[in-house]
Amino acid sequence: MPFSRLFGKKEKNQMDDIVEEGVQRVQELPMDKIFPNQFQPRTVFDQDKIDELARTIRIHGVIQPIVVREMEPDYYEIIAGERRFRAVLSLEMEKIPAIIQNLDDEEVAAIALIENLQREELTPIEEAKAYRSLLDMQDVTQEALAQRVGKSQSAIANKMRLLKLPETVQEAVLNKQISERHARSLLALETEEQQVAILAEIAENHWNVKQTEARIQEILGVKKPVATKKTKPKRQAISRDVRIAMNTIKQSVTMVKDNGMDLDFTEEETDDFYQITIQIPKKK
């Protein structure tokens, strides 16, 4: 089964095809002759789930065989079913039912990735490394890979950007100490030293993503714009106020004169001020 044919199939049929092709070759293989998939994208296994699976196997047996390929005479590598293998191993069973397939490295890597993606059990770092592995092994573009695994090209590109982070940060994502969004925010920092330092601050202060982004903006010197009220030119405002004051005074003087009082009103304008003089006689 060439790699191109494998990637040309609908994901939901890939594992079924493997089982159908090998249904006549189910064998009971010794546990000590089987080793894990070298292309297994998942590096962290939930022990509680494996223990739960082991309890089911203890009662009902292994219902679905694992899939392996023969690497050397009587030595087999797991293609699919490592959780079942680990559960059986914990039960100290000597043999496990298996389907033997003849697949090359590219096909094995593709199956391992697709199987885990379908179950949504990979961490963002595991997923990113699996994409990189497939791209490195086969002359396939991100766009073609995206179509085959049912993801957008941008989703694959964004996942792979996480691999630019220092190993310490990647480990934190892998172990679920920080979220993928935390990790993405760290990509804005210029140096690995800054990224590792902020990782420590996240752990110490239990920052959420928004708090982390605010701290990163502070480091980068990005200041939040402050909204300011629009003000008219100061000179224009002062001129308007002076005119109002002058008109008010003149209107008052006019009212006094209209009431029969004889008074003198003079005004003088200088560079710095207006001078108003009002003379009111004490006697008529």
From Swiss-Prot:
Which InterPro entries does the protein's record reference?
Chromosome_partition/occlusion, HTH_ParB/Spo0J, Nucleoid_occlusion_protein, ParB/RepB/Spo0J, ParB/Sulfiredoxin_dom, ParB/Sulfiredoxin_sf
Keywords of the record = Cell cycle, Cell division, Cytoplasm, DNA-binding, Septation
Function (record text): Effects nucleoid occlusion by binding relatively nonspecifically to DNA and preventing the assembly of the division machinery in the vicinity of the nucleoid, especially under conditions that disturb the cell cycle. It helps to coordinate cell division and chromosome segregation by preventing the formation of the Z ring through the nucleoid, which would cause chromosome breakage.
Predominant place of localization: cytoplasm
Recorded GO MF terms: DNA binding
Annotated compartments: Cytoplasm, Nucleoid
UniProt name for this protein: Nucleoid occlusion protein
